[in-house]
Design a protein with these regions (language model features):
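Periplasmic alpha-helical coiled-coil/stalk elements that build and connect Gram-negative outer-membrane
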Residues: 139-253, 358-361, 365, 385, ...
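Bacterial Sec-pathway N-terminal export signals of envelope proteins
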Residues: 21-84, 227, 233-269, 319-320, ...
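A glycine-/polar-enriched beta->alpha junction
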Residues: 45-55, 62-77, 91, 105-123, ...
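Transmembrane beta-barrel architecture of outer-membrane proteins
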Residues: 42, 101-103, 148, 193, ...
């Protein structure tokens, strides 16, 4: 039994050594990937031009500017030119005649005081600011989603690479155990355990390969084209950390410049202007009218010599009673203002919560990365010790397989922790109101454009 155990132990060590010599596995089968490499910044630039959410938000922001200009136009002089030609036929006891009359007029009207119109302009001015902030918020949200899908692709490819590497190691061990079993130098239980593990890993490879395709399709949805290039991966030579800023500093920064918060602040201004515009229905309006008219038609449609008339007038309109509709509208607008203020409070609380959550999670992830590296090193030592113990007959094949599985699991945990950290940093920057391009540029420095397919080597 000890001889068999030593032989199998040597086989496990040999299989791991062969797998290590092979290095990183080739690109995932079933996924078309070119020899080119792209990174997060490049995909961000493409998404800015292709993501429908970003394009729609820009269109709404531009529309807001035009609506503001439209409201401004109602405050400026309104000039109209009128022209008319009439055919008139007159009969009486003395005369019967027909003639053509012509009327030309130029009229200018200008509000001297109209509270409703002025406050309506202020409302659309605030709405334009709100649309701009919402466009920036949409871009920030889309950037976080892009980063999340980017690292989901990396995680899926890593998972496939790790499963394939584990499958290779286990398959080589199974091949040699089968050869020894044919010579009655191995136990049937060791053979069956290895066979079951190989079959299970083969099924996992299919699922992992499918997940790679699905995750790349999700990334293509944002970019607007199939993403077939290799993706730049996280570097191992940089220290991942949030920043030297305190949590309180991040919160203050977010409350001051978060675009979602600014959009809701503008929403409160919109509601306030709408309320003041509604109250303007109780105020009088004062307007100036200037007109010039030329006509050959006089009183009672009489034909007269062509006459030029010039009129300047001031009109005053005082609302007295509108059936209570103006007061009801004001009360409704007041409730709208309260709702906008409460929405602002809700968003502000959410900003504080999201910043706190992202900061603490990223800070914990940074510490967890170091712990995961130690865990991986320990798992590698544990696997080596298990193989050595198997050689002395102290453990069985199941124990060795468990140690190998633990080593791959530790590698998965390390990679996942790195991706979670980067995603949380981008999320933190989003809620803190940092420009999306600046956030992506800082994260892109942590990526290595020359990294291999998954940057994963079979365990040592």
């Amino acid at each position: 039994m000890q001889v068999t155990a030593r032989v199998l132990g040597g086989l496990f060590g040999l299989a791991a050594g062969v797998a290590l010599a092979q290095g990183a596995v080739p690109a995932a089968q079933g996924v078309s990937a070119s020899t080119f490499t792209t990174d997060l910044m490049q995909l961000y630039r493409e998404a800015r031009l292709q993501d429908p959410r970003i394009l729609a938000s820009r269109a709404r922001a531009q529309a807001g500017q035009e609506y503001q200009r439209e409201a401004m136009g109602t405050l400026l002089p309104q000039v109209s030119l009128n022209a008319g030609v009439n055919r008139i036929h007159q009969e009486n006891e003395l005369v019967q005649q027909s003639f053509d009359s012509e009327v030309y007029s130029l009229v200018l009207r200008q509000y001297l005081y109209n509270k409703s119109t002025w406050e309506n302009y202020q409302k659309f001015k605030s709405m334009a600011k709100q649309s701009d902030s919402e466009a920036l918020e949409a871009q920030s949200e889309a950037t976080v989603e892009l980063a999340r899908r980017y690292f989901t692709v990396l995680a899926a490819e890593d998972e496939l690479e790790l499963i394939q590497a584990e499958l290779r190691t286990t398959q080589k061990s199974l091949d040699r155990v089968n050869a020894l079993y044919a010579k009655q130098l191995a136990l049937i239980t060791d053979q069956l355990d290895l066979k079951a593990r190989v079959d299970g890993l083969a099924a996992q490879v299919l699922d992992a390969r499918n997940q790679v395709s699905v995750s790349r399709a999700a990334l293509a949805e944002i970019v607007g084209r199939p993403v077939k290039e290799k993706l730049s991966r996280a570097r191992d030579d940089v220290q991942l950390r949030v920043s030297t800023q305190s949590l309180e500093s991040w919160v203050r920064e977010g409350v001051a410049q978060n675009p979602a918060l600014k959009a809701n602040e503008s929403g409160v201004e919109v509601a306030g202007a709408a309320l003041r515009s509604g109250k303007g229905g109780h105020y009088p309006t004062l307007s100036l009218t200037l007109s010039a008219q030329q006509s050959n038609e006089g009183y009672n449609n009489a034909l007269v010599p062509r006459t030029d008339s010039y009129v300047a007038g001031i009109g005053l309109q005082v609302p007295i009673y509108s059936g209570g509709s103006t007061s009801a509208r004001v009360r409704g607008l007041y409730q709208d203002q309260i709702a906008a203020e409460q929405q602002l409070e809700s968003v502000q609380r959410r900003v504080v919560k999201e910043i706190t959550s992202a900061y603490l999670t990223a800070d914990t992830s940074a510490e967890k990365i170091s712990a995961s590296r130690h865990a991986l090193a320990s798992a590698q030592l544990s696997r080596a010790a298990a193989e050595k113990a198997f050689g002395y007959g102290m453990v069985n094949a199941v124990d060795v397989l468990t140690s190998v599985r633990n080593e791959y699991r530790a590698h998965r945990d390390l990679l996942k922790t790195q991706y979670d950290f980067v995603t949380n940093v981008i999320t933190l920057n989003r809620w803190a109101g940092k420009p999306p391009g600046e956030s992506v540029a800082s994260v892109n420095l942590w990526l290595n454009p020359g990294s291999p397919a998954a940057g994963i080597a079979d365990p040592r």
